[in-house]
Amino acid sequence: MRKQWLGICIAAGMLAACTSDDGQQQTVSVPQPAVCNGPIVEISGADPRFEPLNATANQDYQRDGKSYKIVQDPSRFIQAGLAAIYDAEPGSNLTASGEAFDPTQLTAAHPTLPIPSYARITNLANGRMIVVRINDRGPYGNDRVISLSRAAADRLNTSNNTKVRIDPIIVAQDGSLSGPGMACTTVAKQTYALPAPPDLSGGAGTSSVSGPQGDILPVSNSTLKSEDPTGAPVTSSGFLGAPTTLAPGVLEGSEPTPAPQPVVTAPSTTPATSPAMVTPQAASQSASGNFMVQVGAVSDQARAQQYQQQLGQKFGVPGRVTQNGAVWRIQLGPFANKAEASTLQQRLQTEAQLQSFITTAQ
């Protein structure tokens, strides 16, 4: 009888040990909330907005004998690894979300993140960060963890051997943003709509200028290339997706300093204006200037020209529209020096809440 009780106790102890071990294996520690120990960085890219999950693209699946389980809680997901780059041509295939693949959009493919969803992608080699929209599945093979569209790869300056970090951004129904991708980060709202100008006529009516609607694209890194063969530094402004901010009026890259322009004085025939409203002297006064202020890029030439004309009339400066691949760049100027271009930048920011940067006339 004593032996039977001893056997029962041993069996009970083994069962308790198995239960304890199994319980420990199934327990997953809740990750600590993201804590920001550094400065807040403003990044750009895809504009995160609440979207219902795709009904067909978020099921667990198998491929090439391997099982993939869709991430149910992106707030607990962080990943780092090599990034691939989309090489398909526009319209050649559909993404897992059912959308036509477009390499000019800031999108990405991931094996298990929800579709659609958003993530902050960081190039660990140079610190550049942008927001991408996950709308496709992959990659499969080559030990890559994510596949970036050509536009996203260009903005990050990545190659097929670049290591990146993936931090999901969670968008609530009210539009608020959270998740690992929001640690030390604020997402720049990219809009090109101009508010009504201030009423300086003592009650006279003023007309508002509206920006182009539709497929407005973020400024591509390719628009920042200067004539300097060494290229632009990786520490570009926050508006362009890098972790540091340049001082106002600083050009990304080194350009030759233009020859000093002679100062010509002439009798004033117009009413005096306040210092804050001084219009920079542009093309007609400084035909030899080579500094331009770029305010954005859109995919439609007619809309770009209309927007450039509206801005030119509002701010009293000439401008131009130039093609860069699939987009049309909207630029104001030229100006004789960076100081004049910077003056317009300040007006664009204060009067129209428009982000811009200084580049050189090609």
Curated annotation (Swiss-Prot):
UniProt-listed Enzyme Commission number(s)? 4.2.2.-
What Gene Ontology cellular-component terms does the record carry? cell outer membrane; plasma membrane
Kindly list the residues that the UniProt entry marks as N-palmitoyl cysteine lipid attachment points.
18
Under Gene3D superfamilies, the record lists: RlpA-like domain, Sporulation related repeat
Question: What InterPro entries does the entry give?
Answer: RlpA, RlpA-like_DPBB, RlpA-like_sf, RplA, SPOR-like_dom, SPOR-like_sf
The answer to whether keyword Cell membrane applies is yes
- Which residue ranges does the record annotate as region Disordered? 198-276
Task: Tell where it localizes.
Answer: Cell membrane
Domain of life of the native organism: Bacteria
Q: SPOR domain: from which residue to which, for each copy?
A: 285-361
| GO BP term, example | peptidoglycan metabolic process
Q: Which GO terms describe its molecular function?
A: lytic endotransglycosylase activity; peptidoglycan binding
The UniProt keyword set, sorted, is: Cell membrane, Cell wall biogenesis/degradation, Lipoprotein, Lyase, Membrane, Palmitate, Signal
User: By its UniProt entry, which PROSITE patterns does this protein fall under?
Assistant: PROKAR_LIPOPROTEIN, SPOR
Give the membrane topology.
Answer: Lipid-anchor
PANTHER family, per the entry:
ENDOLYTIC PEPTIDOGLYCAN TRANSGLYCOSYLASE RLPA
* Main function: Lytic transglycosylase with a strong preference for naked glycan strands that lack stem peptides.
Which protein family is it in? Answer: Belongs to the RlpA family.
Question: What is the recorded name of this protein?
Answer: Endolytic peptidoglycan transglycosylase RlpA
Organism annotation = Escherichia coli O157:H7
Q: Source taxonomy lineage?
A: Bacteria, Pseudomonadati, Pseudomonadota, Gammaproteobacteria, Enterobacterales
- Please state the gene responsible for encoding this protein: rlpA
